[in-house]
């Protein structure tokens, strides 16, 4: 029912795939929306766009930095799905876009990290997707509620809440 949906849970504006065409159209300044976002989100998104813009500048001799480029150093791989993320849309860049909101949850959905394959007492076993590593303190969206990880032992995750269903998709945030 519509009264149980999140009608104002908009997806994140992501125009990173359109940077080249925006530069070609004459755009010289990009604003990163970070209102009400935490430091990790802003750091990740700015680093991601910096990386995308640097690749465009390096591959096109007609482009140059507007000022002396600084050396940007970060000890992570920028990825918008790794911090608060409800899906991405370019909104109205090329006309009306379907599915600009995530009506099912106001929470960050992150990326799919695996599937619950077993539950034992106060822990769950997740079959992780290739390349996924979890750490104590990571956030996970499980079913609709999600939980924080108290402890990791191999494939076993000890959440801070009781879980009860096997087979659910697990999404890391």
Label the predicted regions:
Residues 1-173:
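Surface-exposed amphipathic alpha-helical tracts and adjacent flexible/coil segments at the periphery
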């Amino acid at each position: 029912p519509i009264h149980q949906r999140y009608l104002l849970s908009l997806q994140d504006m992501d125009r990173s795939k359109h940077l080249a065409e925006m530069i070609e159209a004459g755009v010289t300044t990009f604003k990163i929306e970070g209102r009400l976002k935490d430091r990790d989100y802003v750091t990740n998104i700015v680093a991601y766009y910096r990386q995308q813009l640097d690749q465009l500048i390096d591959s096109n001799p007609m482009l140059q930095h507007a000022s002396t480029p600084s050396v940007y150093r970060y000890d992570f791989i920028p990825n918008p799905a790794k911090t608060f993320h409800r899906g991405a849309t370019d909104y109205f860049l090329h006309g009306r876009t379907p599915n600009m909101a995530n009506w099912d949850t106001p929470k960050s959905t992150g990326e799919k990290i695996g599937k619950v394959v077993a539950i034992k007492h106060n822990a769950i076993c997740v079959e992780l997707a290739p390349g996924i590593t979890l750490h104590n303190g990571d956030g996970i969206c499980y079913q609709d509620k999600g939980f924080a990880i108290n402890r990791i032992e191999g494939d076993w995750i000890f959440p801070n809440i009781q879980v009860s269903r096997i087979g659910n998709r697990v999404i890391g945030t």
